[in-house]
Amino acid sequence: YAHLDQIDLNENDPITARWSAEAPYHSDKSTHLWIAKQAIEIMKTESNIEANKQAVDFLNYPQYKDLFSKGLYDADYNAEFNDGGTGIGGVFKGGWKSHFYDPDTKENYRGETNPTALTQGKKYFYESGEHLRNKDYEKAFYYLGVATHYFTDATQPMHAANFTAIDTRAIKYHSYFENYVTTIQNQFAVNTGGNYNNSLSTPEEWIDYAARVAKPEIQNITNDKTFKYYNSGKAQLWQEMVTPAVQRSLGEAQRNTAGFLNLWFKTFTKNVKAPSIETALIYDIEGNVIEAGKNYYIVPSESPYQGLTFEWYLANRYDYVTLANKENNGLSGTPMEFEFYKENDAKLHHGESIYLRMKHSNYDQFQYLNWSNYSSWIHLAQKSDSLADFKIKINLDNPTEYNIFTDDYPLNYENINAKKNWIVLGEKKQKPSSWKFIP
């Protein structure tokens, strides 16, 4: 599902503009994530099933939930999960051949038995389990997300039948189909009926089973009529034709993904208890939980009067983030808001992804902290799918202080005593600056 970058023939493609590789937590833009979240809802409803409550507790713990979601998303975009080489037909960079698996031939669309959605799903199922056994929970849930991505690939009829985006009968139909699915998937959400088939005892058996369930629907999605309507620009007609198959496929995908996740938790988490969400809450200096809709000053622990603020930079006319100047030991800076994703509970937790928004700036709407590959300086930007998200983490050396990260880079200040103190991204292995939050 949702390999929209497969159709990036040119930068003006109308579909690619709707998708970003930097929005991993939005289920309305990723059918993979939507299916996984629905599977977790099913397991929550059916908590009497062995390992289901444990799965829900782990996958709803904010830090692990985010890492799981990131793994689901990265599987489409990180080179280590894309074994396509030159690409589909030598045209596309990448190729995603490891995201396909025909259960009858055991092959991907290139006629190879490795890599496929089955071989890679199996690989990361066990790799994530090993990380959990080694108590590296962050890697465990990230790679479980990757494994689940490959599993949900197998639930998509086109991926189970090796129908690609450059099939000459309907160029890019694969991608337009997946885009259409994201617009209607909520109509077909289920929250009961998880498939916990005990006869399927390995990840490869589950992936093969899911593909066998999905593949027969290909005749209802790719046929002479749907191709005719698609090629003549009659989107409404082909969409009406495929909708019943989409409904059936998504129903099976949600229920079977619950079974796949159930197997992982039964296999690897016996006698392992999920941490309490209460232990992960982030607090301001007055001891209150950080919440959505409230304003805070973000200040260095060593200089609690210098809040983050902004300054216009003439060279490129951006607002850049700095520390406010000291003003007679009086608090200075720009109030900020922690902006949550709509699916979060509006209380901030350790390792949870949020946006950081200044309450005002020199440009309307350009108020969100962001960064680019061209500079380590933090600047202000508009809200978009490519906007940087930040994670607040408890400083283990001093639990009353916090570190701030984006994509594993620490948010740091350069020199607390400098006249101008720009906020920059440190190196991943560099000691992070410590921060506190003043309401």
Model regions: which residues?
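An acidic- and aromatic-residue-enriched active-site/binding cleft used to recognize and process polar
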Residues: 153, 157-160, 301, 313
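Surface-exposed interaction patches
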Residues: 150-153, 410-412
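Lectin-like carbohydrate-binding module/patch detector with strong preference for beta-trefoil
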Residues: 277-439
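N-terminal, motif-rich segments that launch catalysis or mediate targeting to/interaction with membranes
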Residues: 2-135, 139-142, 157-275
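Short alpha-helix carrying the canonical HExxH Zn2+-binding catalytic motif
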Residues: 140-152
